[in-house]
Amino acid sequence: MTAPDDNSIITATAPAEVYDKKNPFPSNLKRRVLLNKEGSDKETIHLEMCLAGSGLEYRPGDSLAIIPTNSTQVVEQVIEAGGFDAGETVELKDGATKPLNEAFASDLDINGVTKNILKKYNALAQSEKLESLLDPGNKAALDDYLWGREVIDMLTDFPVPGLSASDFCGTLRKQLPRLYSIASSPKAHPDEVHLTIAVVRYHSHDRDREGVCSTYTADRVSEGETMPVYVHISRTFKLPEDGDTPIIMVGPGTGIAPFRAFVEERDAIGATGKSWLFFGDQHRATDYLYGDEWERYVGDGKLSRIDLAFSRDQEHKVYVQHRMLEHAAEMYSWLSDGAVFYVCGDAS
């Protein structure tokens, strides 16, 4: 080992920052596109997000976790329903303190209600009506109540005069990340990750309601702004190592996302294995997600076959399972030849 002379400069390289669930990466939203055409009953968006400088790596089949914030409207509604002071300082379970409106916006899940949350809340409410609902003999009634209801419903249905904001926060879960199947190949889109998200908006129990994360990505983050994200690795949902292996992919609705990544990846590496895609949605004219891409892949021979099922384009509804039954013999032949079978379902 040689000692440096007096003019030498010794530099140390700082360890690269690791981005994960505890330390998410602020990913810049580069582009957001509505995939459905005019006249559709659905709202499905395509996101392109920047990962440059993050050190985050993913493979087709992995998911991207997004940690959303709650909408200002919902925060204000919950504060009003509970009779709280928005600026009151509250202590969270991790010991942190902050104004209530900030805690509701980013730290706590102020939407979904569970049986456990109702139990914790009733320790404060001491409501006979809620106690009856929680009785083991009333399971059907409890399940019915929990369906489609949220924290604001709990506050209005079982009000507690003078409820402590800090005590109430103790009944809630922390804001959880939402996982979305990645819809891109890093080989096709270096330093980017793409997502396909169904935006949830509906009316239930006399109120307009919305999906927390889907509307966060659609409404509350503008292009050029950032979202906290990290990669969730899949140990099982991945392409076969051998590019000659045939694959069958079934992805109705937003279930198409990982298969866009699969086809892009196989195209990028020059895989020669056959590929067969089943896709379905409501109407071909308005809901054929990434339709131009699929048609191009088929035309170029990069996708061996595609079978489509648009449920509302004829009098009797047709779904992907019907197309699979129609081609059962050929599917069996593919599987006998070693094809790997994948299904990614649309939650709806």
Question: Predicted regions span which residues?
Answer:
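FNR-like FAD-binding dehydrogenase module
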Residues: 1-348
